[in-house]
């Protein structure tokens, strides 16, 4: 995911900024939704202090690049973006996961590759970034600067937003270096989370996407301590948080969608909330593999057989539930039999939405020391075979929806939908899942507006997507 300050320009434009000599900051956000929320915090602070944003590197007094350093492609994209910003502007501050990554000899990788950057920080370092900005572009003094809205500055479209509930992770998966960059789990105070959620709903957000490194573990680090919100006690615990978010969303007719949910036993407690319509019947669960030996080498906290049992329980409790997951093919030591076991799991589990990565060694990951590294061609071939099975399952599930009526959140609607539009059902998270292609309404009076809901009858499928007739 790549976002620039353009996405926030309507919230940040100062009108006659040039005439008042307000400094402008260029901004690029790379990586996952968790990095996006870090970017939003920085942009919110910039706005609070009176800075404006620039739509180009050349037009900025300084550029901030929020980087990703998880896989090699992300590292390359981040380094290339830093280089581009340096070439066009020359004054660059780097933050994010790549900023915490070591290079040769243990030195900072960003400093080694781009020694002229002004400052480098790791992830979730808003204050450090602002301190660096103040050094190189002093804070403007303007008593007439607009106040920042309660929900902060967002890089997403106005009708959906990400809500980060914690930072870091207590797991030590052998293929992952996130804990070394973002640290152990730190849960946000539940009152702060709920206040942010309420402000987002009040601002017009119709879909709230709950994110973290491990949503199921929310509150573990503080022993599920009791917090207070609206004068009432509430535990810092995933199930309590989800229940309150559902209550907040209901009067606004908004959706709550859960991401990065590890399949712990207490996840079963939120299924009745899904079945009752309090939160979306959608779970993003990172299974990664199904064979117990591979999961053991990955140091994952589950096994395939238990996951099949969980999926069966979830579907019994909430038949309409949609499960999304990600998997890794070609992990070191993975035999053909272990990979076939994974394919059998996919066929039996019937995961609605599945993505798969060919294993890619990440510098600093303990998996690099495992025996049995597979050639790239084998890894890619297994990824392709996995996706063929996953796409067949997905296509079958999509066909089952033809003839059904679904609620669709509209993401695009040229000419108020007179030529059709595009939206998503409860089964579709933004950017990672499919969409619903909306046909032109049959009623002349029917209008489609971005950020609003419409009912649609599903009339067909198109690849990973559905085709719907607005009602």
Curated annotation (Swiss-Prot):
Cofactor: how and how many bound: Binds 2 [4Fe-4S] clusters. One cluster is coordinated with 3 cysteines and an exchangeable S-adenosyl-L-methionine.
Ranges for domain Radical SAM core: 155-396
EC number: 2.8.4.4
CDD domains according to UniProt: Radical_SAM
Coiled coil: none
Cofactor names: [4Fe-4S] cluster
Example of a GO cellular component annotation carried by this entry: cytosol
Localization per Swiss-Prot or TrEMBL: Cytoplasm
Catalytic activity field: L-aspartate(89)-[ribosomal protein uS12]-hydrogen + (sulfur carrier)-SH + AH2 + 2 S-adenosyl-L-methionine = 3-methylsulfanyl-L-aspartate(89)-[ribosomal protein uS12]-hydrogen + (sulfur carrier)-H + 5'-deoxyadenosine + L-methionine + A + S-adenosyl-L-homocysteine + 2 H(+)
GO molecular function terms listed in the Swiss-Prot or TrEMBL record: 4 iron, 4 sulfur cluster binding; aspartic acid methylthiotransferase activity; metal ion binding; protein methylthiotransferase activity
Keywords carried by this UniProt record: 4Fe-4S, Cytoplasm, Iron, Iron-sulfur, Metal-binding, S-adenosyl-L-methionine, Transferase
UniProt xrefs under SMART domains: Elp3
Record GO biological process: tRNA modification
Biological role stated in the UniProt entry: Catalyzes the methylthiolation of an aspartic acid residue of ribosomal protein uS12.
Name recorded for this polypeptide: Ribosomal protein uS12 methylthiotransferase RimO
């Amino acid at each position: 995911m790549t976002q620039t300050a353009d996405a926030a320009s309507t919230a940040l434009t100062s009108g006659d900024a040039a005439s008042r000599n307000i400094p402008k900051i260029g901004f690029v956000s790379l990586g996952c939704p968790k990095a996006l929320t870090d970017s939003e915090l920085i942009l919110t602070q910039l706005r609070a202090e009176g800075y404006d944003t620039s739509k180009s590197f050349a037009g900025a007094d300084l550029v901030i690049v929020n980087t990703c350093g998880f896989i090699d492609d992300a590292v390359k994209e981040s380094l290339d973006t830093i280089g581009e910003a340096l070439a066009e502007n020359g004054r660059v501050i780097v933050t994010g996961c790549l900023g915490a990554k070591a290079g040769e000899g243990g030195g900072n990788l960003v400093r080694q590759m781009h020694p002229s950057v002004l400052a480098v920080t790791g992830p979730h370092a808003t204050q450090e970034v602002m301190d660096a900005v103040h050094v190189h572009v002093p804070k403007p003094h303007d008593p007439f600067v607009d106040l920042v809205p309660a929900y902060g500055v967002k890089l997403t479209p106005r009708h959906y937003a990400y809500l980060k509930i914690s930072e870091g992770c207590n797991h030590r998966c052998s293929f992952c270096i996130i804990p070394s960059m973002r640290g152990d789990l730190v849960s946000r105070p539940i009152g702060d989370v709920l206040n942010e959620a309420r402000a987002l709903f009040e601002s017009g957000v119709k879909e709230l996407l709950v994110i973290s490194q491990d949503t199921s573990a929310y509150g573990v680090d503080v022993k599920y301590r009791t917090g207070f919100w609206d004068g009432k006690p509430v535990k810092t615990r995933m199930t309590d948080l989800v229940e309150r978010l559902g209550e907040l969303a209901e009067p606004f007719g908004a959706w709550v969608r859960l991401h990065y949910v590890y399949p712990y036993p207490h996840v079963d407690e939120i299924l009745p909330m899904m079945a009752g319509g309090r939160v979306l019947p959608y779970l993003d669960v990172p299974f990664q593999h199904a064979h117990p030996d591979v999961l053991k080498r990955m140091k994952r906290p589950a096994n395939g057989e238990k996951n099949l049992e969980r999926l069966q329980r979830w579907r019994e409790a909430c038949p309409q539930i949609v499960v999304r997951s990600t998997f890794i093919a070609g992990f070191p030591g993975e035999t053909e039999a272990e990979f076939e076991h994974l394919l059998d799991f996919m066929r039996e589990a019937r995961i609605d939405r599945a993505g798969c990565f060919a294993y890619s060694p990440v510098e600093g990951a303990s998996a690099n020391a495992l025996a049995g590294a597979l050639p790239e061609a084998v890894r890619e071939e297994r990824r392709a075979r996995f996706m063929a099975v996953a796409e067949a399952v997905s296509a079958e599930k999509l066909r089952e929806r033809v003839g059904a009526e679904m609620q669709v959140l509209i993401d695009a609607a040229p000419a108020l939908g007179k030529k059709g539009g595009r939206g998503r059902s409860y089964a579709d998270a933004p950017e990672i899942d499919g969409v619903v292609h909306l046909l032109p309404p049959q009623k002349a009076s029917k209008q489609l507006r971005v950020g609003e809901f419409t009912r649609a009858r599903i009339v067909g499928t198109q690849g990973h997507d559905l085709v719907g007739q607005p009602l």
